[in-house]
Every structure is written in C-alpha cells, then in structure tokens.
C-alpha cells in the first residue's frame, strides 16, 4: 500500500503515546515490514512521542502533539511535533558517556537513531519536529536472506 497518509492531533497524554505507537505498528505492517522491523519502528515512535509529551509539552493540556505517518512506497515517513520550548539536538547528552550510563532516562534519541534509517530534527515556533524514516527493503537487501 503506497501513498497512504494518516495524521492526528493528540493531547499531551500517555494515551496519545499509545495511539501513536499502535498506528506506527499498523502502518509498518501495511508497508510490508517484517515483525522485528515493525517492533523497532513502533519503539522509535513511542520514544519520540514520549519525548514530545513529557519533555516538549510537559503534559500541558493546552499543548498538542501532531503525528503523521506516510507510506511513500519506498519508505515509511513519520513526523512527530510538539508545542514546547524546542530542543537543541547538540544539548542532548551522550547516553554512552560513563557519567550517563546508570541514569534512568536519556536514551530515547539514541534508540530512535538505532532503529530508524534517518532521523531529522527541525525547530518550530513553538516546538520541535522530529521526522523518522525507515526505508522499505526488498528481500535482496537482507544479507541473511541471500544465504538461505
């Protein structure tokens, strides 16, 4: 299925995070991703949505999170935007630094980058937008498939 776009404007709640995560899983399934990739995409969306609700909007009921999913045929493109004060990507601490290894938070962007092919940040007025891209790969692109 290509050309399919789904967009939501959601409240700054954990229920909204769940909605975004579930939609990501469904869209990844329809785009033809294998179960392990669907799980990674869903986790990346969950992390980005939690960041938008918790860090961006600070659970402010007046602020919204906008989420869009688009299957381009070549990729699943997911955009999540908040209405917070903005994020400077350079200010995000390295989760692999010895000072940060035992902290209970701070790994979300690291995980998002690990699970997605491309991650882009854009400053909004107000807020931050993150775009997550996962490319669709044919069977020949999977090195484990070539040896079966």
For the regions a protein language model found, what residue spans apply to each?
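Conserved strand-loop elements at the edges of beta-sheets that form or border functional pockets
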Residues: 12, 43, 123
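STAS-typified acidic loop motif
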Residues: 7-19
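Alpha-helical macromolecular-interaction surfaces
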Residues: 19, 40-43, 75, 114
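Conserved catalytic/ATP-binding subdomain
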Residues: 15, 36-39, 63
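Conserved beta-strand-loop-beta-strand hairpin that lines the nucleotide-binding pocket
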Residues: 1-7, 52-148
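Conserved polar catalytic motif of the HATPase_c/GHKL fold
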Residues: 47, 51
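Conserved short strand/loop->alpha-helix "switch" segment adjacent to the catalytic nucleotide/phosphoryl-transfer site
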Residues: 22-46, 101-104
């Amino acid at each position: 299925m290509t050309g399919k776009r789904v967009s939501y404007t959601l409240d700054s709640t954990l229920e909204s995070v769940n909605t975004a995560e579930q939609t990501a899983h469904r869209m990844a399934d329809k785009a033809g991703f294998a179960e392990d990739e669907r799980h990674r995409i869903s986790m990346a969306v969950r992390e980005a949505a939690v960041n938008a609700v918790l860090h961006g909007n600070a659970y402010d009921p007046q602020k919204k999170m906008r989420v869009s999913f688009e299957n381009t045929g070549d990729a699943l493109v997911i955009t999540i935007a908040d209405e917070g004060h903005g994020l400077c990507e350079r200010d995000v601490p390295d989760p692999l630094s010895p000072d940060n290894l035992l902290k209970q938070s701070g790994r979300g962007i690291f995980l998002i980058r690990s699970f997605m092919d491309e991650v882009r940040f854009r400053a909004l007025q107000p807020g931050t937008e993150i775009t997550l891209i996962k490319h669709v790969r044919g069977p020949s692109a999977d090195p484990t498939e070539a040896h079966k």
